[in-house]
Amino acid sequence: MLLRTVSSATAETTAALISKNTYLDFFKRSTSISHLAQTHAQIILHGFRNDISLLTKLTQRLSDLGAIYYARDIFLSVQRPDVFLFNVLMRGFSVNESPHSSLSVFAHLRKSTDLKPNSSTYAFAISAASGFRDDRAGRVIHGQAVVDGCDSELLLGSNIVKMYFKFWRVEDARKVFDRMPEKDTILWNTMISGYRKNEMYVESIQVFRDLINESCTRLDTTTLLDILPAVAELQELRLGMQIHSLATKTGCYSHDYVLTGFISLYSKCGKIKMGSALFREFRKPDIVAYNAMIHGYTSNGETELSLSLFKELMLSGARLRSSTLVSLVPVSGHLMLIYAIHGYCLKSNFLSHASVSTALTTVYSKLNEIESARKLFDESPEKSLPSWNAMISGYTQNGLTEDAISLFREMQKSEFSPNPVTITCILSACAQLGALSLGKWVHDLVRSTDFESSIYVSTALIGMYAKCGSIAEARRLFDLMTKKNEVTWNTMISGYGLHGQGQEALNIFYEMLNSGITPTPVTFLCVLYACSHAGLVKEGDEIFNSMIHRYGFEPSVKHYACMVDILGRAGHLQRALQFIEAMSIEPGSSVWETLLGACRIHKDTNLARTVSEKLFELDPDNVGYHVLLSNIHSADRNYPQAATVRQTAKKRKLAKAPGYTLIEIGETPHVFTSGDQSHPQVKEIYEKLEKLEGKMREAGYQPETELALHDVEEEERELMVKVHSERLAIAFGLIATEPGTEIRIIKNLRVCLDCHTVTKLISKITERVIVVRDANRFHHFKDGVCSCGDYW
């Protein structure tokens, strides 16, 4: 009897086990929600409704198939879910783009149960906070993980590092990484990727070097996919070739995506033939490989080849996805190719995807097709934060700063809140416009959102203050930053250069070198610019030579132009000419224009004729060269020749850009043109000018009229310079502000000699500091003296 009972119990247990294993097998093989629902019914029918292992597996499978709310209902049916089931549901919500719900499940676990979260629980919670872009929640969860002693687990550590990078908290990410007792390949890859995505390419490469040199961890294909874009951005061809060799040795090279990464690398380094050779190694290129090669051809000027390859892609029958188009659009720098892609998107209804329309908006803006960009933005049925950022950035890049600011204010009324990308774009617009009050308002917004910890936002703030005339505030913010990248240093150097403070710029440059930051070609450009506006010939010469011989950089046309400017402004015109003739590359119009400007400063008419002939050959439709040459002749009192140059420009219908000056009172910008009569306070403005004129005459002022039109009477010429836009703006500033208040104005053209003299006198008469930003630099007028030393 006992034997029969035992046998019966064993049989029932075996049947139950077989049945349970069968259900688990069903879950693995199920590819539809309806199939899983039928299996669920069978589980209930056969008495397994409370089997937590089966229900957990069912919840996981439903989540994988997107039936997250069905999965949630199963979770709710379990009377006492364990931590593993909580983890499964949290992961499911995150995977199905419901990070907020995942955080709610985590909160329920902590507050309503006696269960203790494990490292996986925290990893999923951190991932959810990152997905929901909840910086505060992420930091709180991190703190809870530390208290529970889970933060040293590798999966959790990688998720925390990834989250901090996503929130632009680069220093926090680095601290977590450094404190991890062990590091695996995933963690190293997360650091490399995080720096790269934050555009900190030098740091990304350094982490990669540390992985190779200091760690016993092996790199994998993901490592290469993360590091290659950083190497490409810095155009580090030699390092790229070393990584290519390493990839071959480690067996990672055979991966198609890695091969594609090398195509992009060589293309960005200008080695398009090497990229093309790699592309031919594909038996059947995928869409990503086509994208990389099309980009390579486009960025290297091979437009016909890029169009041909795009047609080949279309004829291949490949079905493009929205993600493919998003990656393809930004790299296509030719308008005809963009039209082709845009047409395909219209035909295939891809414009309904916010990511696709945003990508097209971005590329149209880069190609100066701003109206097409705005039309796409307005017609987009589903706007996103990136789409707002793309349009604001587009306006800023095209110099339409007022439109950028207007759209930013419109965005604030929408459901979207600005992120650091938005803030950086709008600060750039403020800098271009010279709108200090608006820039300060944005700075206040930054403080309220905790974006100041972002290295990019802080750098943008430094640039804004420098370009709006407040170099002291720019330096204060610079000194407060605990972490600086090469862009931060470059911005501060450039700011000092813009204000004519060359020695301060050099001091920052040497401080940068001492801090261990490697200068880039842009760094040298900023330093040379600063030297040119401070008359530092010897220092500029040394910097230029060190760039070539010590750091191995090949000078660009811009570097050569800066050296010509340094020599030319100092009066070394023949040496500047010899320097141009010895250049290893074609000088180009910018270099010759710089020398022509030096001819104007030092009144070398003969050399000016020779240089202008070169310029008229290179760029015959540039009215600026004609105006500059005419002014040189006028300064030499060769009025007939000046008239001939002007008549030539007139016959060619070349129009000079009208001059204007902006002054900001409160947060309201006021714009003046020469002889402007449109301002509501025009009567008071001209009366103020008349009073100032009398006081200046008493001080011995004589108008500089030699550059005014020679074919009018002297009295009329005096009147012409008397109503220049900067004088009207200064007069209005004197009326609209309290005595002793600093006046700041922005002029779109170079300030003329007479207005420069007048502004010095006004600063002395009114006992005001007057800051003028013209097309070249800043002038700080105080007590009758200008910071430029009359050297501009």
From Swiss-Prot:
The PPR repeat ranges on this chain: 51-81, 82-117, 118-152, 153-183, 184-218, 220-254, 255-285, 286-320, 321-352, 353-383, 384-418, 419-453, 454-484, 485-519, 520-555, 556-586
Entry keyword set: Repeat
GO biological process, one term: mitochondrial RNA processing
MF GO annotations: RNA binding; zinc ion binding
Region (Type E motif): 591-666
Region annotation (Type E(+) motif) ranges: 667-697
The keyword Repeat appears for this protein: yes
Name of the protein in question: Pentatricopeptide repeat-containing protein At4g30700
Organism: Arabidopsis thaliana (Mouse-ear cress)
